[in-house]
Amino acid sequence: MSLPLRHALENVTSVDRILEDLLVRFIINCPNEDLSSVERELFHFEEASWFYTDFIKLMNPTLPSLKIKSFAQLIIKLCPLVWKWDIRVDEALQQFSKYKKSIPVRGAAIFNENLSKILLVQGTESDSWSFPRGKISKDENDIDCCIREVKEEIGFDLTDYIDDNQFIERNIQGKNYKIFLISGVSEVFNFKPQVRNEIDKIEWFDFKKISKTMYKSNIKYYLINSMMRPLSMWLRHQRQIKNEDQLKSYAEEQLKLLLGITKEEQIDPGRELLNMLHTAVQANSNNNAVSNGQVPSSQEHQHLKEQSGEHNQQKDQQSSFSSQQQPSIFPSLSEPFANNKNVIPPTMPMANVFMSNPQLFATMNGQPFAPFPFMLPLTNNSNSANPIPTPVPPNFNAPPNPMAFGVPNMHNLSGPAVSQPFSLPPAPLPRDSGYSSSSPGQLLDILNSKKPDSNVQSSKKPKLKILQRGTDLNSIKQNNNDETAHSNSQALLDLLKKPTSSQKTHASKPDTSFLPNDSVSGIQDAEYEDFESSSDEEVETARDERTSLNVDIGVNVMPSEKDSRRSQKEKPRSDANKTNLNASAESNSVEWGPGKSSPSTQSKQNSSVGMQNKYRQEIHIGDSDAYEVFESSSDEEDGKKLEELEQTQGNSKLISQDILKENNFQDGEVPHRDMPTESNKSINETVGLSSTTNTVKKVPKVKILKRGETFASLANDKKAFDSSSNVSSSKDLLQMLRNPISSTVSSNQQSPKSQHLSGDEEIMMMLKRNSVSKPQNSEENASTSSINDANASELLGMLKQKEKDITAPKQPYNVDSYSQKNPAKGLLNILKKNNSTGYPRTEGGPSSEMPTSMKRNDATNNQELDKNSTELLNYLKPKPLNDGYENISNKDSSHELLNILHGNKNSSTFNNNVYATDGYSLASDNNENSSNKLLNMLQNRSSAINEPNFDVRSNGTSGSNELLSILHRK
């Protein structure tokens, strides 16, 4: 039988018995580390005291109330072994109290939802009100300590409310207090402490009232007075944020109400995509009906009306895109698809204008144009495109693709090409919107009209600037009426200088005229995109650089303003003349005249030539394109104006050349003076006389305005160009053909790049390169030049007749028949006879030597030598550099060259020509044909600028073929 157990301490009245029980429970059996210090042992004494107060005294109310000090003294007195320290108990308790004050305290300042009230607690042993708080335990963080203490004292869990960044921290009497700020706690919560004899009261206090009556009322507060200011600031900030959020939400709601935006009107993106697909399917079904001829007559009439409205509308309109879809196809385009019911017609409204107007395609000949504002940048990787895309069978399992037909590539209309698929939805086109300044109707009017109205030209800024680079000689057929206004001498100079614009591309790029049409179209597509991406400022800079290059190419009779400005920076003329031939050969004959520019200027010239090559290659598409002829004529006009500007800069200030050369020195240079020849002086004397003959103004031509250019600026430039040049073309032609090539350049100075010069470049060097020879003790020989306008006119007529024959389809040449019909053809055929044999150069010393024997035995010399031809041949002979130049004939250059063109047209035996090594003295025979001598002289000039071992046959052509190719060049 078991005995009923009772509580050990129930009805116990002996204090010693109770103390013995507590001593065993809390002190004797504790770990040794907890007894290692006085403070740690007193913590166990404190826990035993709390147990006595919380439990034993409640069971035995008659027991005395014991504080920590009296309780510790009774324990030590009952068991002295537990106290092994040499310190008294009261002193140990004071030390223990100081230690407890150093322990950090963590608590919470709890506010209600309106931020108007704060929650405070009052302890059982204190009459002051403060935050719920507690001491941090060992290895416990701040957040966990705050949550634990608040839950013990008020029974509320702050896990979902606490923010580790919102707190107030203070140090009071060496004790750290960290109070976290909590808001949004409900006032209706039933707060109840979970510990005994620690919290007496829990109440909500009005924060505003506390802040006013803190120091006046009888209620005591702890920690609140020291934290009142930061609490007030935090509350103000929280109220402001709350008010701003409410204000923003209120304003948003009111704005939506004003705009009529409600949540019900918002469309789901998935639903919107589905609606778009349904619309596309419905459009495709309508297209099938149109292809089958089921469109009602009223709808067809509406389509035709819209089509005519788009063609006739000329002014710019800007309107937002309409949600309605344009008609998928016009009735005129449904015919190719009428027989095939499985074909979906194209749905691109942007191609309607081009498909319905085939003449526009024929006129433009596939030239690129700026896209319309409503067109998406669709890419087409096929080499050619068809104005009507290839039919694609429908796929009803997949969503329709209304954008499958991209922008047609109009470079080639030979065959169809499969369009690349494009998955974007179609861009809607406004029903009432017309095309802007790049309208096809306006473009067609420009192409068909030879002289459009100046007002129309000034109001548009076409983007077809890619075709304004280079010069096409075929465009002269469209401009014969305008060229008659030029003087005969000026037109002769222009005809002789035209090959220079196209022969530069021979060494760097292949001629695109021999390429297939597809290849040309691909090149134009890539270069058109590069050109459109470049700025107008770069294009204008390139044009200025080309102008400076043309100035250097001009005949060096008088120094230009550009050379005068750079007179302090150039090299001595003697040194420049020695090294200039190498510089010109290394740059692939880019700089024809004597090089005076700095290396930076030469690099700019090379870059400008590269840009010219890029755009010049794009114009060789077809000879019969009206659009290309129109653009080429404008470009030819620009080239002529630039040449006139060049001559104006060279003769704007008729200052004596000797005066300008006297101060043309650099630091460390010995002053010297170059003595000009009598030929240059005679030419300078004829400037005033010849300037009065070329005063006829040219008829203005059509000029496509560039981006950023206005008609007023174009008119000013035109006036400047019209009044630019009055220099005689006969003088320039004579100076061009007269300049000898120096033989002082040693063979080791020749650039290896000269071997890569094409035949065109060699002949152009012969005709246009300025003299770089160094006069040595030259004697002044007086001679004068007279003007013969009648001979120049006759020569101009023959050259124009020659050019017309060249532009015709090329046929096998018959020398006898052509020589009887056209004197210019006679000279060409005579030069062509010399094509059978080429002679390599040999090096015989420091200076370049010419071949010692050149024989031709293909015909007999049966005509006498013309006197005037002999005189012109003497001009063209290389002059001995040690004895000065030979005397020049008094005959006019145009008359002399005309006599050569009228000279013997039969083949003759070409005798040996012996050249002296030091001065290229030519031993001529009176029985030689003057035309053959002219050819030999030109070949000798060509050999003077090439490498010593350069063989003319290395390129497969001789000097005569090279000259013939220049005269035939387009």
From Swiss-Prot:
InterPro entries: DCP2_BoxA, DCP2_BoxA_sf, Dcp2_NUDIX, NUDIX_hydrolase-like_dom_sf, NUDIX_hydrolase_CS, NUDIX_hydrolase_dom. GO terms for biological process: deadenylation-dependent decapping of nuclear-transcribed mRNA; mRNA processing; nuclear-transcribed mRNA catabolic process, nonsense-mediated decay. Keywords: Cytoplasm, Hydrolase, Manganese, Metal-binding, mRNA processing, Nonsense-mediated mRNA decay, Phosphoprotein, RNA-binding. Residues 300-314, 560-576 have a biased composition (Basic and acidic residues). Pfam families: DCP2, NUDIX. Mn(2+) binds at E149, E153. Residues 101-228 form the Nudix hydrolase domain. Residues 526-539, 625-637 have a biased composition (Acidic residues). The keyword Ribosomal protein does not apply. Its EC number is 3.-.-.-. The modification Phosphothreonine is found at T677. It is found in: Cytoplasm, P-body. Component of the decapping complex composed of DCP1 and DCP2. Interacts with mRNA, LSM2, LSM4 and LSM8. This is mRNA-decapping enzyme subunit 2. It comes from Saccharomyces cerevisiae (strain YJM789) (Baker's yeast).
